[in-house]
Regions:
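N-terminal juxtadomain amphipathic helix
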Residues: 2-95, 261, 271-273
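Extended interfacial segments that mediate partner engagement and assembly in macromolecular machines
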Residues: 55-150, 154, 229, 234
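Conserved SAM-binding strand-loop segment of SAM-dependent methyltransferases
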Residues: 159-172
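Short amphipathic alpha-helix with an adjacent loop that forms part of the alpha/beta core around
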Residues: 170-180
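A conserved beta-strand element that flanks and buttresses the S-adenosyl-L-methionine
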Residues: 183-186
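A short glycine-rich, Lys/Arg-flanked "PGG" loop and its adjoining helix->strand segment in the class I
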Residues: 198-213
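Short, glycine-/aromatic-enriched active-site segment of Class I SAM-dependent methyltransferases
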Residues: 214-239, 243-245, 250
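Flexible, glycine-/basic-rich loop-and-beta segments that form/coincide
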Residues: 267-293
Length: 293
């Protein structure tokens, strides 16, 4: 059964807009606009018939950093407007549900059981708990975190303990004190949504077990260009990733990417597997260098 959640919200569009003058990865004030899609409404924010005319619109522009080559949104919408009452529900797509079930199996195969079984996992941006529920069924002690208050009851109905908050260093420290370190951290299709990634990755480093894995999936810039997938550009997606800038960012936070995969889902994504730098738990796959070539 598909779940549909509607939202009606009034806002001052000017007050809700945050413009970036600096690169969200390296901090350089060397951004150049590479694509301007004009002003658009928020994705999935479709008013009922007869109620059109008052929806806010915001600039939608891509900028490239001349220094580190990262591509990001030039203008961002305030997160409380985007995520306070979130519209997209993972379980509404049977294709995505199968994809996340497959991901859970791949994670279990890679990590394997320890003395305490498969251990604890946390899905960052867990939405309605679809991935966390698949992890739980495999034997993980699955948890979730998501800022959308309206989605938490859907995840809890699946038996997932959900923290309603944005992920970062402080909440990671709190979770570690209460639950312990996590063997697995996941962020599927939520990693591109995070504007300020330094605090986020500090949280990952705080919460991840020494031999644990951090798995993300994110829209891949090359696929966006090759497939002209402009429909993946909207206000929630702050970043459009290549592997090299991501590797440099992770390294600054003591994390090492040891494998990557290109996926066809969502017009093309990159799945990245990371661990603590120097952990030595897993060798770096040749696919990492090949993807950077």
């Amino acid at each position: 059964m598909k779940t549909v959640i509607n939202r009606t919200r009034e806002t001052d569009a000017t007050a809700a807009l945050l413009s970036s003058r600096h690169c969200l990865l390296c901090g350089a004030e060397e951004l150049e606009i590479v694509l301007d899609l004009g002003e658009t409404g928020l994705a999935n924010n479709l008013p009922a018939a007869g109620a059109c005319g008052g929806e806010p619109v915001f600039p939608l522009r891509l900028a490239r950093c001349r220094r580190c080559t990262h591509v990001q949104l030039a203008d961002r919408v305030a997160p409380e407007l985007l995520y306070g009452h979130y519209l997209y529900v993972s379980s509404a797509s049977s294709t995505l549900d199968r994809h996340l079930r497959s991901l859970a199996g791949a994670i279990a195969a890679r990590t394997g059981p320890g003395p305490d079984g498969l251990g604890r996992s946390l899905d960052i941006g867990c939405n309605d708990g679809t991935l966390a529920a698949h992890m739980s069924r495999l034997g993980f002690q699955a948890h979730g975190i998501d800022p959308a208050e309206n989605l938490a009851p859907l995840a809890r109905a699946r038996g997932i303990a959900v923290e309603v908050d944005y992920f970062g260093r402080e909440i990671a420290r709190s979770l570690r004190n209460r639950l312990g370190a996590m063997r697995v951290l996941t962020a599927t299709n939520s990693f591109p949504h995070i504007p300020e990634l330094n605090g986020y990755l500090e949280g990952v480093a705080e919460l991840l077990e020494p031999g644990g894995v951090f798995v993300i999936e994110a829209h891949y810039l090359l696929d966006l260009v090759e497939q002209c997938a402009f429909d993946t550009i909207y206000h929630e997606h702050c970043h459009f990733w290549r592997l090299e800038p991501m590797m440099a960012l992770f390294a600054r936070h003591g994390l090492e990417i040891f494998d990557c995969e290109r996926l066809p889902v969502h017009h093309g994504q990159l799945r990245v597997w990371a661990q603590r730098s120097g952990a030595g738990a897993r060798p770096v796959s040749g696919r990492v260098a090949a993807q950077c070539a």
